[in-house]
Regions:
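A generic structural signal for beta-strand entry/edge sites
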Residues: 24, 61, 135-137
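Function-determining sites in protein domains
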Residues: 83
Length: 179
């Protein structure tokens, strides 16, 4: 058997390429999903990178993606790898502008964590801060654009978005003072 025949018969090679071309992914997630050894995954990633079939971005995570994706889409994917940022984005996509305290209650994340996520999303110009006395509310600037990016970068979330239901806390939580 020639080397070419061996390569084409290897299911890991095609699986890795198809997975990366269908949606961006991290190296470790790719190893987990493909159920191939990490050395094998690394080998085929190197081959696909040399052939310019895929691209990668190294940062906190090693992100592998299709060359068809725009840098802004990869930047958004990298942002939503953070669970708190992802929770805030999904809640704000599904709702009207909310205050920080409402986001804390809905997402069940800590106040400092929500604060960091909001600061990051404001800096990236994904959300807008509305100043309303006595508090501010936050909303997504362009929901349709953000949702189209979500469809390209995280199709599982996008396809199941209608099933995602917000469990709003009772308004009394924000109004009562506990002794």
């Amino acid at each position: 058997m020639s080397k070419i025949q061996l390569i084409t018969k290897n299911p890991c090679r095609n699986l890795i390429l198809n997975t990366i071309l269908s949606k961006p992914t991290t190296f470790m997630k790719l190893v987990s999903e493909s159920q191939c050894a990490s050395e094998t995954v690394e080998k085929y990633i190197s081959i696909h990178l040399q052939d310019h079939k895929i691209h990668q971005k190294k940062g906190k995570f090693r992100i592998l993606f299709s060359p068809e994706l725009k840098p802004s889409e990869i930047e958004f994917y990298e942002l939503i790898l953070n669970p708190t940022v992802r929770a805030v984005v999904l809640v704000l996509l599904k709702s009207n502008p909310l205050s920080q305290i409402e986001l804390v209650a809905i997402t069940d994340k800590s106040n400092p964590s929500i604060s960091r996520a909001l600061k990051l999303l404001l800096h990236k110009k994904i959300i807008l801060r509305n100043y309303n006395a006595p508090y501010s509310t936050y909303g997504i600037i362009n929901k349709s654009r953000l949702f189209s990016i979500l469809e390209k970068t995280n199709p599982i979330i996008a396809n199941n978005f209608d099933q995602f239901d917000l469990c709003y806390p009772k308004p009394s939580i924000f109004l009562t003072i506990h002794n």
